[in-house]
Amino acid sequence: MPDLLIELFSEEIPARMQARAREDLKKLVTDGLVEAGLTYASAGAFSTPRRLVLSVEGLSAESPTLREERKGPKADAPAAAIEGFLRSTGLTRDQLETREDKKGAVLFAVVEKPGRPAPEIVAEVLERTIRTFPWPKSMRWGTGSLRWVRPLQSILCLLSDEAGAEVVPMTLDGLTAGNSTEGHRFMAPARFAVSGFEDYRAKLARAFVMLDASEREQAIWHEATTQAFAQGLEVVPDAALLSEVAGLVEWPVVLMGAIGEDFLGLPPEVLQTSMREHQKFFSVTNPATGRIEKFVTVANRETADHGETILKGNGKVLSARLSDARFFWENDLRTVKTAGLEGMAEGLKQVTFHNRLGSQAARIARIEALAREIAPLVGASPDLAAEAARVAKADLQSAMVGEFPELQGTMGSYYARAAGLPEAVAQACKAHYQPLGPSDAVPTDPVSVAVALADKIDTLAGFWRIGEKPTGSKDPFALRRAALGVIRLLLTNNSRAGLMGIMLPAMNRHLEPFDTSDFTPYERDLLAFFHDRLKVHLREQGIRHDVIDACLAMPGNDDLTLLVKRAEALSAFLKTDDGTNLLQGFKRANNILTQAEAKDGVEYSFGADPKFAETDAERALFAALETAEAAIGPALQAEDFAAAMSAMAALRAPIDAFFETVQVNADNAVLRRNRLNMLHSIRATCARVADLTRIEG
């Protein structure tokens, strides 16, 4: 079975597009081959800045012959009907078969489609793939109609096996497929022929091209860390930058340079961001001083002077970039020292947050008021929380954040310290944006927690009030992320702040610009949104959705910390034998009771009377219910849900024995009513812990 090698050689492919392009090339080609009847053993896609490559192993040499039977008209049908059938099948009358069925003689056509050779299929699939390739952006060049991310220069398409290699014959807008490619643009630009994937990969390596992006990443990181270690330094990890740089070079050459002394006083985040965003440099820190003192750059070629000229040029460009950053830094510090952070924030009055939610300054005023109200609930000083909220977004008006928006919050913390504000306020300037995602760090300082909650809840309340809710996959204002942030803030800090209590003032503040209609539906809808996000969060931690629903149905479901404690205890309980068996007993009791209440048109909620117990099983269940009630109440009061579940588990054996020996729907009406009331007691006792009717199984 032959192997297939495809290389699409072009001008430089943007690094950010390469990973997706590898996946698309593999999927489009292999799916097309399979749809055409070819099978394969394995496939792998690769990329460098100038080439997309696909290797398919164990490809079948041809597609199978297909035999199709088509039923036609009756043998004695009008000639016109038979002629139409013949045209549709491409057969003649004598090629049809006549078969008997229950309606008489019927004509059948047996159409055989012979298999097609792999080269023919590959050529069709590859041309379709190239013409329909889903680049985020593409271009045309010359006079042809072909579109590609950058001008496509050559196509290598080769089928090879033990007998040799065969070029797949195809021509696309003047490009004819061949068996040759080029090496490194500067170090080995000559074309060379290949006979298969292994030969291709080996010759590329000799021509200074490292084909596999992951290998380039490993080579860059290994060499960078080795050079840093030799000087007692450490490279700052940056996975995204490493992936991007690996997509910029075919033959990585790691070089380390020094940052000028004049710039070492800049905040490390400024140095790292400026070098990463503008120069694609890695930052190198000195563990002894904690400063970023050097940088790592990755060249795309080896040079006779071992990179000295490259480093010199990069150093000049870096100095210019860092001079700009130093200007922004010094200018911002002067503003802070003369006008303070609140003075810096004055410009936010002219910055619109949303055309229906007012300016950034108006939003900050709402967050300040809300942070003051939330502060006592999370153990923070109301005055400190209000002060932090008032200045937390001041750096949005700074020159540094104007140049590097990703430094918002970080620069605010530096400027707050420069202004002499309390450390808790400085920390909150940075931390109030957190957590930014499911794995981001969660603030724990009370002032930071208060401001972070106020920021996110104001955002949610505002957009909810104007009807800008997430729909399907669309969430332009990142409201799902904001809700998850609130959830993680409350749970991580074990906060008992009820969502309804902190959403109410937020909703109130958003009423003023609108009508004064009842906002309760908005508040309830937003609480339901929080519950949906909580379900997703807990499911990722292994708690079933029905367990969460059973706890959401309980009172106080806006206290997320309490709700999660209950859900964790119930989840653990249901994994035990006692939990599983008690659930079955509860469901049996609930089903019998529900059917009886529907049939009789009454609710059996009166207390069962022990004096009507006729059997030992009934008396034992009465005693067990009394004991469980006595234990569950204090356990719930103490929020010891594990103890409440344990008390509930003690009902398992008495309930089992009751159903084994007692007929609930007795002929005696008094006994039947008393036993149904007992089933209600079982339901009511269990319902104090969780709504078990919502548990599946």
UniProtKB/Swiss-Prot annotation:
Main location: cytoplasm
Pfam families attached to this UniProt entry: DALR_1, tRNA_synt_2f
Keyword check for Protein biosynthesis: yes
Enzyme Commission code(s) on record: 6.1.1.14
UniProt-listed GO biological process terms: arginyl-tRNA aminoacylation; glycyl-tRNA aminoacylation
PROSITE patterns in the cross-refs: AA_TRNA_LIGASE_II_GLYAB (PS50861)
Localization per Swiss-Prot or TrEMBL: Cytoplasm
Enzyme class: ligase
Keyword terms: Aminoacyl-tRNA synthetase, ATP-binding, Cytoplasm, Ligase, Nucleotide-binding, Protein biosynthesis
DNA-binding found in the keyword field: no
GO molecular function: arginine-tRNA ligase activity; ATP binding; glycine-tRNA ligase activity
Reaction equation(s) it catalyzes: tRNA(Gly) + glycine + ATP = glycyl-tRNA(Gly) + AMP + diphosphate
Alphabetical list of InterPro entries matching this protein: DALR_anticod-bd, Gly-tRNA-synth_bsu, Gly-tRNA-synth_heterodimer
One Gene Ontology CC term in the entry: cytosol
Quaternary organization: Tetramer of two alpha and two beta subunits.
Family according to the record: Belongs to the class-II aminoacyl-tRNA synthetase family.
PANTHER family in UniProt: GLYCINE--TRNA LIGASE, CHLOROPLASTIC_MITOCHONDRIAL 2 (PTHR30075:SF2), GLYCYL-TRNA SYNTHETASE (PTHR30075)
Protein name, per record: Glycine--tRNA ligase beta subunit
Species classification: Bacteria, Pseudomonadati, Pseudomonadota, Alphaproteobacteria, Rhodobacterales
